[in-house]
């Protein structure tokens, strides 16, 4: 069996950058890591509660955190920031206040910026949310996969692979189904590949969705 490494960690420092940029003393490192996790969870929960979308897509591609001695800079990359801003005009300020209360930033300023990504459906996280929404609405998994591939074709990607594992369509025996369109060279380090794994709770149990998108070759 081929051992499958996480494509993002495999390419760190070449085509993939870090999502958290900060340094700390070894003894404080675990605290910083937990703080990052809490910040990301808090933002995701807030967006989930306050974003009114029919499709159920939150549209968060990634959250980057940069820390300095007196400042925590959080950049949220979203596919559809308009929806959040329209449903809550002061949403960003509210989110900032919530985070400041949560982490009692007395001596550190917290700053949040929202950036729109150009091609939302070229991002695996947003696609995974789309597929999850379809599966929750009991759309057949093949139909959901094909629709997702159609959406990525509009985003000028060079290849995509989608894998769904679990009790698909409520069958008694769990299985793995996958589909690939175009090229996905996982062994090539200079190939810019975006990856995401996402769990979705359906009435039959939990399904795992994995998406690899081949964006470009450097």
Swiss-Prot record:
Domain KH type-2 per the UniProt entry, residue ranges: 47-118
Pfam family, one: Ribosomal_S3_C
GO cellular component terms given for this protein: chloroplast; cytosolic small ribosomal subunit
Keyword rRNA-binding: yes
PROSITE patterns for the chain: KH_TYPE_2, RIBOSOMAL_S3
UniProt xrefs under CDD domains: KH-II_30S_S3
Gene Ontology MF term list: rRNA binding; structural constituent of ribosome
SUPFAM superfamilies named among the record's database cross-references: Prokaryotic type KH domain (KH-domain type II) (SSF54814), Ribosomal protein S3 C-terminal domain (SSF54821)
Keywords: Chloroplast, Plastid, Ribonucleoprotein, Ribosomal protein, RNA-binding, rRNA-binding
InterPro entries: KH_dom-like_a/b, KH_dom_type_2, KH_sf_prok-type, Ribosomal_S3_C_sf, Ribosomal_uS3_bac-typ, Ribosomal_uS3_C, Ribosomal_uS3_CS
Main location: plastid
Location of the protein in the cell: Plastid, Chloroplast
Any one GO biological process: translation
Assembly: Part of the 30S ribosomal subunit.
Similarity comment: Belongs to the universal ribosomal protein uS3 family.
Name of the protein: Small ribosomal subunit protein uS3c
């Amino acid at each position: 069996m081929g051992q499958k490494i996480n494509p993002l960690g495999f390419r760190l420092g070449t085509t993939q950058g870090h999502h958290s940029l900060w340094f700390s003393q070894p003894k404080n490192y675990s605290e910083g890591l937990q703080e990052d996790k809490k910040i990301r969870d808090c933002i995701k929960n807030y967006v989930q509660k306050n974003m009114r979308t029919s499709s159920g897509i939150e549209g968060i591609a990634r959250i980057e955190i940069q820390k300095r001695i007196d400042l925590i800079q959080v950049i949220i990359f979203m596919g559809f920031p308009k929806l959040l801003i329209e449903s809550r005009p002061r949403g960003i300020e509210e989110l900032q206040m919530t985070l400041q209360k949560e982490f009692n930033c007395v001596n550190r300023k917290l700053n949040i910026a929202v950036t729109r990504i150009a091609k939302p459906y070229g991002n695996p996280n947003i696609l995974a949310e789309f597929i999850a929404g379809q599966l929750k609405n009991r759309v057949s998994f093949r139909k959901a996969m094909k629709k997702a591939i159609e959406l990525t074709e509009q985003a000028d990607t060079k290849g995509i692979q989608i894998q769904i594992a679990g009790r698909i369509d409520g069958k008694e025996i769990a299985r793995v189904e996958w589909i690939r369109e175009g090229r996905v060279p996982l062994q090539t380090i200079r190939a810019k590949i975006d990856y995401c794994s996402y769990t979705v709770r359906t009435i039959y149990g939990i399904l795992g969705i994995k998406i690899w998108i081949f964006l470009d070759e450097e």
